[in-house]
Amino acid sequence: MHRYRTHTCGALRDSNIGETVRLSGWCHRIRDHGGVLFVDLRDHYGITQCVVDPDSKAFGLAEKLRSEWVVRMEGKVRRRPEGTDNAELPTGQVELYVADIEVLGPAAELPLPVFGEQEYPEDIRLKYRFLDLRREKLHQNIMTRGAIIDSMRRRMKEQGFFEFQTPILTASSPEGARDFLVPSRIHPGKFYALPQAPQQYKQLLMMSGFDRYFQIAPCFRDEDPRADRLPGEFYQLDVEMSFVEQEDVFAAMEPVITGVFEDFAKGKPVTKGWPRIPFAEALRKYGTDKPDLRNPIEMQDVSEHFRGSGFKVFARMLEDTKNQVWAIPAPGGGSRAFCDRMNSWAQGEGQPGLGYIMWREGGEGAGPLANNIGPERTAAIRTQLGTKEGDAAFFVAGDPEKFWKFAGLARTKVGEELNLIDKDRFALAWIVDFPMYEYNEDDKKVDFSHNPFSMPQGGLEALQTKDPLTIKAFQYDIACNGYEIASGGIRNHKPEAMVKAFEIAGYGEQEVVDRFGGMYRAFQYGAPPHGGMAAGVDRIVMLLCGTTNLREISLFPMNQQAMDLLMGAPSEATTKQLRELHIRTNLPNK
C-alpha cells in the first residue's frame, strides 16, 4: 500500500465499498455528532467524509485534529447510512470508516478560514495566499485558467502555429509604459529591461524566416495602479504571421478565440461571425472603443433637432460646427424618478446634469427639453430614435472629443439600471480602423495612438502627404462584454516608412536606430509583410470565470500598491548587492 494514499479524496465510489484504503489531505471541516467525529478530508481532487467512532484506536488522535491539519487516514470504505447521501459531492454515497490516523502536518491558528467563501480583507488574503488558494472558488478559478491556456495552445497548433520562447532580459523601448529595469553587473551603469511585450522579437522571428508564431508570454509594465490591470505583470497569447493581410489574421484568430470561449462558456451563447466596427463608429454609437454589445442601446446624433430650437443652451452650442448633441435612448426609462436619478448620477460624475425627454401615453413628450423645443421637434426625435410610450432619452452636448467617454458611461449606466444587458452571453466584435496618431495635450505634440509598429493605411504616401491625425492604421482590437481582450495590427515592414512614422511622432532616425537597432537592421535585409495580435489571457480567464477582479484568477498577485505581501517584494537590496552592481540609491525626501 502506498505510504500516503491509495486513492485521492475525490475518487471513492460505490464500487470501492469494502476496500481498505488510505487517503491524505487537509481537515476541511470537523463535526462531533453524538460523540462520533466526522472529518471532511480534502485534497486537490475533492472531499471524502471520514468517520471516527469512539471505540476506534484513532479516536484519541482524531479529537486533537483542527482545521487545515494535514493527515493520512486509513480505513474501510462503507455505504453511507440511508438518508445521509450528499448529492453535491461525487463521493457523497460513501464514507471512510477510520481505523488509523497519522498527522503529517499540523496547522497554526488560521488567519482566515478555508471552509466557506466569506469575504476577508484583500491584504490578509494576499499575505496568506497559500491558504486563500485552498478555498474552492479560487482553487477552481486557477484550474480553469490552466485549462483555458491548454485550449489556447491546442487551437493555435491546429491553426498551424508553432510555440517559441522569446527573451525576458532585453533592451528598453518606448512602448507606452515605463520599463522595469534590471542592472547589469558585468556592464556597470547599463541596464536590461523586462519586456512590455515580445513585440520586436516576434517581428524579428518573421524576418528570420519563421511563419506562424505564438507563445503565452509574460509582459512587464511599471505602471501606476489601475483597476482593470494587474500591477507589474500580466500574460498574453502573443501571435505573429508572415505574408498576411488584416483579413488573414481575422480568419486565423477568430475561430481560436471563439472556440476557447465556447469551451468554457458553460452553455452561454458566444458570438459567431463577429461584427467589424470602425473605431469612429464605436465611439459614436457606444462612447467607447470596447463596447459591451450585450447592451442594445445605440447613441445617435440628434443635433439637427436642436439647431435653432427653443432650448437655447444646446442651440448656442451648435453655432460652433464642432459641437454636437447625442441622444442616449432609455427603453422603459420614462419615469420622472428614473430621469432624476440619472441626472443626479451625472452630477456625481462631475457633469452639469443630463437633459432628458420622456414619452407619455399617446406619444407626447414631457420634461424641460420637450417643453422648450416643442412637440414637432420632440416627435421628430422620437421617430429618429424609434422610442415608444414609456421610454425616455437622455442628451449630451458639446465637443464629442470631450464628451464621448461620459456619454459611453451614461449608456452603460442606463443599460444597467434598466436591466437591458443580457448577462448570459459573450458578445465579441472586431474594432477596426484605429487612428494612427493622436494629439498629446500634455506634451503638445502628435503621438502614436496605439502600437507604433502598425502599418498606416495608405503606406508611406499617406505619411508623406496626409494630416497625421487623419491617418488610419491597419490596427484592430477584440472587444468582449465591455472589455478589450486583444489588440493587434499589420506591421510596418518597410524601413523608410518606419522611420517616417516615428519622425511624425517626434523621433529622429538616429533615435529609431538606437532604440530599435536590431529590428531596423533586419528591415534592410528583406522583411516580409507580417501582422499579428496579442490577446489578454488574464482578462479572458476573468470573463470566463465570471468575476470582475483579476486577482481572483491569478496565483500570487500583487496588491494595488504593487507590493507582493506574501514574498515581501519589493525589498531593499543589501549593501553588497548594490556594491556589486555599482549602484547608489538616492531616495526622495518623505
Curated annotation (Swiss-Prot):
Q: What class of enzyme is it?
A: ligase
Which positions bind L-aspartate? E175, R221, H450, R491
Report the InterPro entries cross-referenced here: Aa-tRNA-synt_II, aa-tRNA-synth_II, aa-tRNA-synth_II/BPL/LPL, Asp-tRNA-ligase_1, Asp-tRNA-ligase_1_N, Asp/Asn-tRNA-synth_IIb, AspRS_core, GAD-like_sf
Region entry Aspartate, spans: 199-202
- Stated EC number for the protein is 6.1.1.23
Q: Which reaction does it catalyse?
A: tRNA(Asx) + L-aspartate + ATP = L-aspartyl-tRNA(Asx) + AMP + diphosphate
**Where, per UniProt, does this protein localize?**
Cytoplasm
Keywords, in A-Z order? Aminoacyl-tRNA synthetase, ATP-binding, Cytoplasm, Ligase, Nucleotide-binding, Protein biosynthesis
A molecular function (GO) term: aspartate-tRNA ligase activity
Domain of life per record: Bacteria
What this protein is reported to do is described as: Aspartyl-tRNA synthetase with relaxed tRNA specificity since it is able to aspartylate not only its cognate tRNA(Asp) but also tRNA(Asn). Reaction proceeds in two steps: L-aspartate is first activated by ATP to form Asp-AMP and then transferred to the acceptor end of tRNA(Asp/Asn).
User: What is the name of the protein in this document?
Assistant: Aspartate--tRNA(Asp/Asn) ligase
Family classification: Belongs to the class-II aminoacyl-tRNA synthetase family. Type 1 subfamily.
- An example Gene Ontology cellular component term from the record? cytoplasm
- The primary gene name is aspS
Record flagged with keyword Lyase: no
One Gene Ontology term of the biological-process aspect is:
aspartyl-tRNA aminoacylation
- One Pfam annotation reads tRNA_anti-codon
Positions bound to ATP: R221, D222, E223, E484, G536, V537, D538, R539
What residues correspond to the site Important for tRNA non-discrimination? Answer: H33, G83
Assembly: Homodimer.
